Design a protein with these regions (language model features):
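Preference for intrinsically disordered or flexible, low-complexity segments
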Residues: 1-222
Length: 222
């Protein structure tokens, strides 16, 4: 089964993309079937200067498990933001300090203080390079490198939705939110521009070893 292209990122466009020495291009592919609960991905680090045989339209597989495994082509406009760990990755003492600090702001949004911190302050929704995983559907789990045991870091988050749960849309991008999509895209959903769906609306995190990016990566759905 041919794998599908999912993302192509250039180091010149994405400051947080820490490419291995001698490379400046990351290509992410996946199999459009669950292995066992999400698509299995493959990472390719390359030098853009050596990529000469470019396909205008990548071939589609003869079959897919779900339509949500075929991404809609998108042109990226990366925006750099600052994130913080999910409250579940913090000490009990720091969680309590954040809870007390967030009470007034959370009340204005009619949200629980911990939910306010996670949704509005700590974790940006949508597709992203780097950052922290969100643990709203499962508890934090260790992510050691299978080769050397180093704690792995998130390389790429593939998300079902681009928008968060807060009504104020604190993570909305800079571009004009009222911009109209192309009339050719009558099925376009601004909350899901890639049309990708992970599970019932989750995220798929791809993590790599910071000591040796060539070590096998791991996948996690949250």
């Amino acid at each position: 089964m041919a794998m599908l292209p999912v993302a192509q990122l250039y180091a010149r466009d994405v400051p947080d993309l820490r490419a291995p020495e001698g490379t400046d291009l990351l290509q992410v592919l996946w199999c459009p079937f669950d292995h066992p609960i999400m698509p299995r991905t493959a990472l390719f680090w390359r030098s853009a200067a050596t990529v000469t045989d470019i396909l205008g339209t990548p071939p589609e597989p003869p079959a897919m498990q779900f339509d949500g495994y075929l991404p809609e082509p998108c042109l990226l406009h990366p925006e750099q933001v600052t994130e913080y760990p999910d409250h579940l990755e913090l000490s009990t003492e720091l969680q309590e300090q954040l809870r007390q600090w967030s009470v007034p702001q959370a009340a204005e949004e009619d949200m629980d203080p911990q939910t306010y911190y996670d949704c509005v302050l700590s974790n940006a929704p949508g597709w992203k390079v780097g950052g922290w995983p969100a643990w709203d559907s499962t508890d934090p789990s260790p992510r050691p490198c299978p080769e050397c045991g180093t704690r792995m870091e998130v390389l790429l988050t593939i998300a079902t939705f681009e928008e968060g749960d807060d009504e104020g849309r604190s993570w909305s991008p800079y571009e004009n939110p009222a911009a109209e999509p192309s009339p050719d895209l009558d099925h376009f959903d601004p909350g899901r521009p890639t049309a990708v769906q992970i599970g019932s609306g989750y995220r798929q995190h791809l993590s790599i070893c910071p000591a040796a990016p060539e070590h096998p990566h791991i996948e996690l759905m949250t």
